[in-house]
């Protein structure tokens, strides 16, 4: 039985407001094109861009751990190519967009399950005004704000831990 849902930087789709398609030549446009095979499977750009975006927050040991499953070029890196291709952007791929839209609608309608929204500021996925307004409308929810980008858990782990520690005892 689910007693509560805590989330941060979740992939959520407000009604009628899908994330825009990637701009031509952007990182996600490259990942989703034939050029993605070289960029991700051979050059490991997905993992390396994640690490470079967290430069000040990851130790060398942390960065090595992020790289560890993907040290060998080729198919070992396939999950890091599949994921950006499955992320619903511009309503595509349709099956993923519909799945995300369905669970987003469920989260918005549910009143029984307590929710904790750990808002990352400045954040990324939930920084769009329509996305932020949508999740703030979820019922039976508390919100806390912590500093960080999309990978907020690497930037503010202690603040997230404190928020969870304060929220968990409120669950029945």
Predicted regions span which residues?
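Flexible "cap/lid" loop of the alpha/beta hydrolase fold
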Residues: 2-47
